[in-house]
């Protein structure tokens, strides 16, 4: 339990930031899920559009510190690789 005023304030701030970060992470997961569903159905056009929508969301999450930059790049790269494989 926080004793000092500054520690209590820090606890409140952490709770707010955690809520925001959870929402952002959930949003990114939703975009990734849409790409994966499109890949599973084998629809190249839908998968490409979903990837175009997901990529900036994933990068934005990395910029905001929700995901590590390398993790975001890896996710985008692997999704793009799978979408590209549909066209082959």
Curated annotation (Swiss-Prot):
BP GO annotations: translation
Gene3D superfamilies named in the record: Ribosomal protein S20
Disordered, as annotated region: 1-21
UniProt keyword terms in alphabetical order: Ribonucleoprotein, Ribosomal protein, RNA-binding, rRNA-binding
GO molecular function: small ribosomal subunit rRNA binding; structural constituent of ribosome
Any one GO cellular component localisation term in the record: cytosol
Family, similarity comment: Belongs to the bacterial ribosomal protein bS20 family.
PANTHER family named among the record's database cross-references: 30S RIBOSOMAL PROTEIN S20, SMALL RIBOSOMAL SUBUNIT PROTEIN BS20C
Function: Binds directly to 16S ribosomal RNA.
Protein name, per record: Small ribosomal subunit protein bS20
């Amino acid at each position: 339990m926080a004793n000092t005023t500054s520690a209590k304030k820090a606890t409140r701030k952490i709770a707010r930031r955690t809520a925001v970060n959870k929402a952002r992470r959930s949003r990114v997961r939703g975009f990734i899920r849409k790409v994966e569903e499109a890949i599973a159905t084998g629809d190249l056009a839908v998968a490409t559009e979903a990837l175009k929508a997901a990529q900036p969301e994933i990068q934005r999450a990395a910029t905001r510190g929700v995901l590590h930059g390398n993790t975001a790049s890896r996710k985008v790269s692997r999704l793009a690789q799978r979408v590209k494989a549909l066209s082959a």
